Amino acid sequence: MADEDDGLQLNICYLQRVPKKEINSKAEEEAYFKENISNNNNFTNNRAYREKTNKNENNLNNNKNNNNNNNNNKTYNNNNSNNSYNNNNYNNNSFNNNNNNNYNNNNSNNNNNSNNNNLNKKPTFLEKKIQQEQKQKELKELKGPQHHRYRNQENEESNAIESNSNNFKDKYKFAENKTKKDEFNRPILETIESNIKVEKSETFSSMNWGSLQLSETLVRNLVGHMKHEKPTHIQEASITPILKGNDALVKAQTGSGKTLSYLIPVVQKLTEQRVTRSDGCYCVIITPTRELSSQIYEELQKLLKPFYWIVPGIIMGGENRSAEKARIRKGINILVATPGRLLDHLQNTQSFPTDNIKWCILDEADKLLDLGFEKDVTTIINLLDSKKRTMKFKRQNILVSATLSEGISRLASLSLTSPVYIGLDSKVLEKGENPFQAAEKEMLQAPKQLDQFYVEVESKERLTSLIAFIRWKTSNITIDKGDVASGNSSANSKMIVFFSSCDSVDFHHYMFSNMKMDKERGVKRTKKEQIKQDKLIQQHKQKNSKIFQTGNESDDEESDNDDSDDSDSNNSDSETDEEKEIEKQIKEATSNPNYRVKTSVFSVPIFKLHGELDQQTRTKTFFDFKNSPNGILLTTDVSARGLDLPSVNWIVQYDPCSDTKDYIHRIGRTARLGNQGCSLLFLLPSEKKYIDHLAKFNVSVKEMKVTTILQSLFYTSDGQLKKTSKSSQLESQVHDLQLLFERFLIYDSKAKEMARCAYQSFLRSYATHKADVKSIFHISYLHLGHVSKSFALRETPTELNKMSAGIKGAKAAKKGDEDTLQKQTADFKMKNYKSVNEFSDGLNDQPLQRANFHYESASGVIHNIYQRHFNRNERDEADKNSNPKEIKEKKRRLYDKKIESNKKFKSK
């Protein structure tokens, strides 16, 4: 039985059992191989067995070469059985069931034979894959990357974990390990704001208002009512030359008081003579935006408070034209206007006298040219110059701007005659160099007390980073000596966030104001304390809003007693109702463990401002944000020029500006008149070279890590540490916040449509950067899938492009019928696309419409609507009805056309 068992051959799992036989020579070994191969025809087909035979043949060839070259090869065989061989010229093979470990030390002559034998061997799948990868690496080294996305970024970070943008988990883990923690194991957030104190001598002059040859009543108004104790440097330098009557070009940095520098001398000159309303307009102030014109008008009203006989006025687009015409007919002495509406009244309003105009002031002149008002401004100046002959005096023209350019030089050559340059470098003026060329070479000036930061963020993390930063800077997340601050940081916090398009402003404002989040529970606070505190905060906000609307904390004293009694009873009833509601909420919270209070995203009010809003809402939001103690303003570049918004702490540039000069104007909304301020610029990894571009203009920007911003997600809006199961993982906090906004878009169709419009407008605005920055902000650098993620969209870019065509058509077809409107919608456009989508299961509600077939019961013939059969009778009837003369004329025309085409061809 043992011999029969030894003769068994097993082909299962590529194993074979062979009889044990002693081999004493090479010839016996070869014969032994041949016998086993002939007996095992089925097994020879297996790849593993062929590889074993090839190895054995290679060993035999190597041994023959060793005998010819007299090379002594030692073999060390560790056999578990009693059979051992003392031959040093060949190796025992692996056909024995014992474990043999062969160590061959071959000479250099055997390398050629072994290489030849390896060529005959077929490589495995893994070997092929390794070879392909090596070839690809060699090709990449020889030939550089074709696309800019795969280029290596210059100035890589020293830390390899943070430089790898794809490895988010390692980045978050590294940030968690690196952050400092207090005694209670809470992450300590860095204090970014630096307490830079600017001396008054750097902003304000040492002179008094009386030394500038101003009237006493005007000085008392400036000091007492307007609370301006001393003039600024630009006001000191500009008031005296403007009072002399010279044309002036005023250049100064933002927030230095340029408005009063030309208003004060105009008012001083008008107070010297007795001015009446019937005299008409003496001064025209042209501004680029409506908000700036309303701000100047408000400042002018304060300045003219003691001089009641001087009448100010304002005209701008969006207002009632007939009401403006009536005000002009009554008489306006100082007029603030936008260029389009002013040109309209000059051309069409006959009751607009321009004979007495002594001053024409262009505020933010460079912005007037950038917005395309150059043609309107030139026509206005030409209309005013046409009446020079009838005027008894010379008109004084003043240009005011924070930056100078070639367009302003053209405008200055048109309007100014031998002007005085105020605010430029005195060395340049002494040399006689052109001030406009010197201004282009001049570096951009930012206030010293302004801290500038930038953060490098991936596209998919932009939305969560923005929300985390706003929550950080508008809430009470401050730690002092291991305790949470009581909450004075958000009481006076204001922030302006700049976007590149109006659609983006509308989308973010709608999402931030309408979305409700679960109330984040702190570590120490209970549900009862939470509900009570939330209710108290709401009551406090309602009281403040009532006071803000009415302007008085108490009612009028001359009210009836009955009314007061009724009001007291109503107040008591409302208080009892509120107490009952609080008790109900407490009962629900104690009974239901899953009870959660819904709150808004931010704890401060949110405002929006852009050019597509109507004029009433624009003025209302502007003054509401200006007068409110805290808030967030989402806006475009409309708010970047000239607006004086007090107590703004942070400027966030979510979308970088298209022009480098607009960067200075944006950050100039904070750190005004010596106050402290900060700015933050969001950049993609491909846009990091923009920092080097700003350094050419002497603008130094510090870096802020994304992880420092995202650390604020560990805290609630009240400044407490979140009590959640995932609070120790930063990645989970970011992921949950992103999912929250994506789910909001799924259930809100209006928000989804607004997000799609914002996505398309962002791409269009990204392609409008100027030539000097085009190489940095190029649209081909964007990852469109990640950009859609930043708008909380889950659709792919191809789907969004299909939908955008439907949205544009629906906007265009406003007066069409229902069928055309339905065809232009996004759902109709995506109907066929979704049914052929590679990710669909083929079971959609509206599959592709196949060809409709009509069945004729009489003949039983199937007619396809796309394959119409020819009917001779129809052709005959058509020929009968047609006129033979017309047919001949058509044939003759076709024949003439053919002849003419042949002639042209021959001539060519």
Curated annotation (Swiss-Prot):
UniProt GO cellular component terms: nucleolus; nucleus
List, for all copies, the residue spans of the domain called Helicase C-terminal. Answer: 518-738
> Which region ranges are annotated with the description Disordered?
55-165, 519-590, 872-908
The protein's Enzyme Commission number: 5.6.2.-, 3.6.4.13
Signal peptide as annotated in the record: none
Quote the catalytic activity from the record. ATP + H2O = ADP + phosphate + H(+)
The UniProt similarity line reads: Belongs to the DEAD box helicase family. DDX31/DBP7 subfamily.
This chain's protein is named ATP-dependent DNA helicase DDX31
Gene name tied to this protein: ddx31
